[in-house]
Amino acid sequence: MDAKKAVRVAVVEQVGYREWTEELGSDREWIIQTLQSDIYAAAQKEAAGYGGFVLPIRYDIMLLISSNMGVQEHARVLDAIAGLSKVKVRMASYCGVKPLDAVERAWNALRRREERLIYERCEGEEYTAIAHIDLNNVTAITRAEGPVRTYYEVMDLMAKISKVAEKIGAITQYLGGDNILAVLPLNGSVKETVDMLLVRSDLKAGIGIAPTARASLALAAEALHEIRSKINPGPLVVKAQ
């Protein structure tokens, strides 16, 4: 990838969230989980309209992969979240060749500054590279091991992939089932980067490279479909826009 390209990531923080949860009393977890789901759904739907994609990570703190989203589009996603949240919501959006660097810049800005929305202009061309990673034969594994043991296996896999991702500046998110997403650095070869993330021989990955997160995910899904349907042997297939 061209080193001049950079990925934009926004950090969304619900300020005072823990304190709010403690005010709900002991019979609160169902309330918290329901609200978290509603906020995530609203944020994801709003972001998708502008080519973005939300990673819930902690739910009280979420990431918005937002390459080529303008400040007003960020504001609309922030408003969608604030309309449901019970606490103050803030957002900071920064760029970086490595997505983890963009997150760290945004988080530091939220700690230093008081604005509701902080939007730093990107020096490079905004782009996104995303890998959609999954486990081979997960249906057969689930039939043999059951849903809980299969889930534990995928969580162990997620932890191993995330350790590698941290070292190279990528961001990972569990998507459910056997699916793991990785937002990739834009320096070097994406194939070589993803090859490091495939920590087992029974993994495959579709990789999408595009100006927006939503387009990148669509391309990654197409690439993964080619591997699953044996149109392309894989285990890595890259599609770019």
UniProtKB/Swiss-Prot annotation:
GO BP terms, alphabetized: biosynthetic process
EC number(s) given by UniProt: 3.5.4.29
Entry keywords, A to Z: GTP-binding, Hydrolase, Nucleotide-binding
UniProt protein name: GTP cyclohydrolase III
Annotated family: Belongs to the archaeal-type GTP cyclohydrolase family.
Listed InterPro entries: GTP_CycHdrlase_3, Nucleotide_cyclase, Rev_trsase/Diguanyl_cyclase
Entry keyword annotation includes ATP-binding: no
Function recorded in the entry: Catalyzes the formation of 2-amino-5-formylamino-6-ribofuranosylamino-4(3H)-pyrimidinone ribonucleotide monophosphate and inorganic phosphate from GTP. Also has an independent pyrophosphate phosphohydrolase activity.
Parts of the chain that traverse the membrane: none
Reaction(s) this enzyme catalyzes, per UniProt: GTP + 3 H2O = 2-amino-5-formylamino-6-(5-phospho-D-ribosylamino)pyrimidin-4(3H)-one + 2 phosphate + 2 H(+)
Nucleotide-binding as UniProt keyword: yes
Source organism of this protein record: Aeropyrum pernix (strain ATCC 700893 / DSM 11879 / JCM 9820 / NBRC 100138 / K1)
